[in-house]
């Protein structure tokens, strides 16, 4: 029995200690005052290991993220930052492990930098309140230095100016730190500018600041030597972050102690015995001054709690959504996967299940095919997924689907959309060229050349199919003013060139066909307010009418229009009676699909006087984000912000009466009108809402499902995606002589050792 029990204990211990030899992406090292122990952050927890290396022991094990450990001078306590209550707060705990005590309770990020000389308080950085005498710009990035008692209590401000990585001298009369002059990423390398960090010293008694470093690049992370006169810090003087030594008496003189290349040294700390500890290339090192750095061979005794696949709820967070032409379901994208849901949210079908991203999803006219872009195998291409079984009418309850590549070339192709007749697909090639792909011939042709656009971010180009599939409205950048977009018109067959419809010199954006192709509406800043620098800060919705008849009809007063409508209804009734008597279909009968296709008459544009046939539809300027017309063209619905967040507003175009239609209070909004015109499909802050087009009453579409998420595969994709974005879009074709491919391999090896978004974002 004793033998069996001993075996069970041994097996249990071996299971716990199954882990990783030589793990990577070890961050935020802190060497103990006696130089015997090194703390570090790994996978969101604080670990402890001998300064000689060996098996590391976790001091925290939680679902929250803990980092930035610092030691008390007596070596009995440690402080660290944790987000276990939402934002990052300062905690303190025994150095050997135990219960952590929360010391700060503010709503902003707060991170410890050191203990005071007498170990009675902890210094930390946070953004709370500047002194009235502080002349720096009051941005949230400009933190202050505070202290909090180790036993808890009132927080005191030490410095109103940013003082990062602040540590105190042994007597407590000096604080050494690096500054923060303006926004720049903490992890940017090799840059020189007016906002790079410098090392400073603050005399507590005289309250005097003295700048110690003057290198035009980065100097940061200073720590005192035991004599309180010399100090060590990290600098890019040789082009890569390395450890340097200088002194308060002669700060202009510095000596480089390490000579690492390509990758930066980070997180410098020092023990009382002079041992330095730091991180380089994802691993930990210690060094005695005068000796070479020694890598710590570390083994992580992990319990394998990181699951590769996780069940993730899908109940919001849609990055895009589109209503199906049948009006019965909608497609949406969540975490790069495509789903289709019924309009009540009760039936949801996951369409794609890949580690890469799918986006720009839209339906075919018959609602049986989805077209979208996918970044498969490190290249954006166009794909379709169709319902295979004829007896199945809806995606949300379909059982067999078929995916096929449509446009798959070495070029980047995305942002596809079916033509209304279903015969073609428009898409962007290499972000700036608008092309049309003919599904019958399987050939593509250009309708808007790349010289007419400049894409700054994916998704910033816009086009819209005409109802007759013969034209496309486009938002383009004229050569003279590339970043002041205009609205243009191009033929879907690529002939005739580009026509500038707006010619305003202001921002004209997001044109939409309305009134069965008789007009378009778009947003323009021509009547909007201007900022002091001259840029537009608000816009209006305008309409342009492609025929004189449509323009004249729009100008009728409410009373005049009522008379015209009365006569039209009378004429229609007489036509119905004649048709009925002759045995034919009435004017009100629902046409068959084929008849409906034939009834889509070609759009004939009256070019004579076209630019004069426009009207401002909104009664006052605002920050409108989207706009649609009712099916009869009598109401303008638009999303804009007059209060907190975007709301849905409506304007009666005959009377110009404008009112709040539905209170959304959302930050990110988009919408489209249902095919029958009875409701508005709104996406507000990642959730879908139905708004009745007559009453304005809203009904949330409560999607509540879940998906299996492979976090590791998703993370690997995002890494490749970000790397490719930089390579494809950097303005310098030669990437400024940087060997970008080598950096891909240098950093990709860290991916297996990252299990959270904080570490991933830093990497």
Functional labels for PLM-detected ranges:
Residues 34-36, 74-76, 118-120, 171-173, ...:
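Short coil/turn segments that connect the beta-strands within blades of beta-propeller domains
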Residues 30, 70, 114, 167, ...:
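Conserved beta-strand position repeated across blades of beta-propeller domains
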Residues 615-616, 640, 644-763:
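Intrinsically disordered, Ser/Thr/Pro/Gly-rich linkers and terminal tails that flank
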Residues 21-47, 317-336, 618-634:
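Beta-strand-rich domains and repeat architectures in extracellular enzymes and scaffolds
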Residues 255-269, 499-511, 625, 662-671:
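Conserved blade-ending motifs and adjacent loop-strand segments that build the rim/top face
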Residues 20-26, 54-56, 302-318, 399-405, ...:
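A short helix->beta-strand "capping" segment at the edge of beta-propeller domains
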């Amino acid at each position: 029995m004793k033998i069996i029990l001993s075996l069970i204990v041994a097996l249990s211990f071996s299971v716990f200690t199954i882990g990783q030899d030589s793990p990577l992406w070890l961050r935020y090292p802190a060497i103990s005052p006696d130089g015997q122990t090194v703390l570090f952050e790994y996978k969101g927890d604080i670990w402890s290991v001998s300064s000689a290396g060996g098996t590391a022991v976790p001091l925290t094990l939680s679902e929250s993220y803990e980092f930035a450990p610092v030691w008390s001078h007596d070596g009995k306590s440690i402080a660290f930052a944790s987000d276990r209550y939402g934002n990052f707060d300062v905690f303190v705990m025994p150095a050997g492990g135990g219960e952590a005590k929360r010391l700060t309770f503010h709503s902003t990020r707060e991170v410890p930098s050191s203990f005071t000389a007498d170990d009675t308080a902890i210094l930390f950085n946070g953004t709370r309140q500047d002194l009235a005498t502080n002349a720096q710009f009051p941005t949230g990035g400009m933190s202050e230095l505070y202290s909090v008692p180790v036993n808890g209590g009132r927080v005191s401000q030490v410095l109103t100016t940013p003082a990062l990585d602040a540590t105190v001298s042994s007597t407590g009369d000096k604080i050494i730190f690096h500054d923060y002059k303006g926004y720049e990423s903490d992890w940017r390398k090799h840059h020189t500018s007016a906002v790079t960090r410098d090392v400073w010293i603050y005399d507590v008694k005289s309250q005097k600041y003295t700048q110690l470093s003057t290198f035009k690049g980065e100097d940061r992370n200073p720590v005192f030597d035991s004599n309180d006169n010399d100090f060590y810090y990290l600098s890019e003087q040789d082009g890569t972050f390395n450890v340097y030594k200088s002194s308060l008496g002669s700060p202009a003189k510095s000596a480089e102690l390490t000579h690492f290349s390509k990758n930066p040294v980070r997180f410098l700390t020092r023990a009382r015995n002079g041992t330095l500890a730091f991180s380089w290339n994802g691993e930990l090192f210690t060094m005695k001054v005068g000796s070479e750095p020694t890598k710590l061979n570390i083994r992580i005794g992990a319990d394998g709690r990181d699951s590769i696949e996780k069940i993730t709820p899908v109940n919001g967070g849609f990055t895009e959504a589109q209503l199906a032409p049948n009006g019965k379901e909608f497609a949406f994208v969540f975490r790069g996967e495509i789903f289709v849901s019924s309009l009540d949210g009760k039936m949801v079908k996951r369409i794609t299940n890949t580690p890469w991203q799918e986006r720009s999803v839209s339906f075919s006219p018959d609602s049986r095919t989805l077209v979208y872009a996918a970044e498969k195998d490190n290249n954006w291409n166009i794909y379709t997924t169709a319902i295979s079984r004829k007896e199945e009418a809806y995606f949300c309850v379909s059982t067999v689907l078929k995916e096929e590549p449509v446009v798959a070339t070495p070029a980047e192709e995305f942002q596809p959309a079916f033509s209304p007749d279903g015969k073609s697909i428009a898409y962007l090639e290499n972000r700036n060229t608008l092309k049309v792909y003919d599904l019958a011939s399987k050939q593509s042709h250009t309708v808007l050349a790349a010289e007419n656009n400049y894409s700054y971010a994916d998704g910033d180009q816009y086009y819209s199919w005409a109802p007759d599939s013969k034209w496309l409205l486009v938002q383009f950048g004229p050569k003279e003013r590339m970043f002041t977009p205009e609205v243009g018109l191009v033929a879907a067959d690529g002939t005739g060139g580009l026509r500038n419809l707006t010619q305003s010199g202001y921002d004209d954006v997001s044109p939409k066909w309305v009134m069965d192709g008789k007009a378009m509406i778009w947003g323009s800043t021509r009547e909007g307010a201007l900022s002091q620098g001259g840029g537009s800060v608000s816009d209006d919705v305008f309409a342009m009418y492609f025929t004189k008849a449509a323009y004249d009809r729009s100008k009728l007063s409410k009373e005049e229009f009522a008379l015209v409508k009365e006569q039209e209804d009378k004429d229609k009734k007489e036509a119905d009676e004649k048709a009925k008597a002759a045995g034919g279909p009435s004017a009100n009968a629902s046409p068959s699909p084929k008849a409906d296709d034939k009834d889509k008459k070609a759009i004939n544009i009256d070019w004579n006087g076209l630019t004069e046939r426009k009207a401002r539809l909104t009664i006052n300027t605002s920050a409108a984000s989207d706009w649609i017309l009712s099916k009869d063209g009598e109401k303008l619905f638009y999303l804009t912000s007059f209060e907190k967040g975007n709301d849905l507003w409506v304007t009666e175009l005959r009377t110009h009466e404008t009112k709040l239609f539905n209170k959304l209070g959302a930050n990110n909004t988009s919408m489209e009108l249902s095919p029958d015109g009875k409701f508005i499909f709104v996406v507000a802050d990642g959730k879908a809402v139905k708004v009745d087009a007559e009453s304005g009453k809203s009904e949330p579409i409560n999607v509540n499902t879940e998906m299996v998420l492979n976090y590791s595969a998703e993370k690997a994709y995002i890494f490749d995606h970000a790397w490719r974005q930089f390579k494809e879009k950097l303005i310098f074709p030669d990437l400024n002589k940087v060997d970008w491919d080598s950096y891909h391999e240098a950093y990709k090896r860290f991916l297996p050792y990252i299990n959270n978004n904080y570490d991933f974002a830093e990497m």
